[in-house]
């Protein structure tokens, strides 16, 4: 029987050298949710830091798990699939938060299904769950310069940090990402898209 829990997974890379990098937008947004709903993380089978909480909005309570995979980005699916199988959480109750280079910094797009858009963490989750039909909160980090060394530029870009102006805007942006995940859970995907995608 499917669980009534939701699973929110914020993607990133573990370890201090990746803290505060563009690729760790998911981790940072998960930390905002953890603080907001008093979630404490502990180890899940060496695959993820996992916590459990209850959200209360508009007089409704929703139980959820909050995960930060420890597998490194490209194997994120191992962690998400393990947690969803262990706790019997269906894909339609999964929200994944991740960085997205196709969106300018500060923009958020909510979607379910569709292409992984070149994001290796999403490709891994699609593969491990056997479906792309889960909700995603795409957090814009802007684009590396194209050119002869496009791949290297991209890697350096996502593993780089934010400039001073962006750092100032980051707390509000992360709070918006957390709001987007909550809106999906409480009001549904279409409402979340209406609220966040047009900004």
Curated annotation (Swiss-Prot):
Binding locations of tRNA: 18, 72, 74, 120
Reaction equations catalysed: an N-acyl-L-alpha-aminoacyl-tRNA + H2O = an N-acyl-L-amino acid + a tRNA + H(+)
UniProt site positions, description: Stabilizes the basic form of H active site to accept a proton: 99
Record-annotated site: Discriminates between blocked and unblocked aminoacyl-tRNA: 13
InterPro entries cross-referenced by the UniProt entry: Pept_tRNA_hydro, Pept_tRNA_hydro_CS, Pept_tRNA_hydro_sf
Location(s), subcellular: Cytoplasm
EC numbers for this chain: 3.1.1.29
GO cellular component: cytoplasm
Keywords: Cytoplasm, Hydrolase, RNA-binding, tRNA-binding
Oligomeric form and interacting partners: Monomer.
Protein name as catalogued: Peptidyl-tRNA hydrolase
Lineage: Bacteria, Bacillati, Actinomycetota, Actinomycetes, Bifidobacteriales
Gene field: pth
């Amino acid at each position: 029987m499917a669980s009534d829990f939701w699973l929110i997974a914020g993607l990133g890379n573990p370890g201090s050298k990746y803290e505060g990098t563009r690729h760790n937008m998911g981790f940072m947004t998960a930390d905002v949710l953890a603080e907001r709903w008093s979630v404490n993380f502990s180890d899940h089978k060496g695959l993820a830091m996992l916590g459990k909480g209850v959200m209360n909005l508009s007089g409704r309570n929703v139980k959820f798990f909050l995960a930060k995979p420890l597998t490194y980005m490209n194997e994120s699916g191992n962690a998400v699939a393990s947690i969803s199988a262990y706790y019997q959480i269906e894909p339609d109750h999964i929200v994944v938060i991740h960085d997205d280079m196709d969106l300018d910094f500060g923009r958020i797009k909510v979607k379910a299904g569709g292409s992984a858009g070149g994001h290796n963490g999403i490709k891994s989750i699609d593969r491990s769950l056997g479906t792309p039909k889960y909700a995603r909160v795409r957090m814009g980090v802007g684009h590396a310069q194209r050119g002869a060394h496009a791949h290297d530029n991209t890697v350096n870009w996502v593993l780089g940090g934010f400039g001073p102006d962006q750092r100032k805007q980051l707390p509000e942006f992360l709070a918006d990402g957390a709001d987007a995940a909550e809106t999906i859970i409480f009001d549904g995907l279409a409402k979340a898209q209406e609220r966040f995608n047009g900004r």
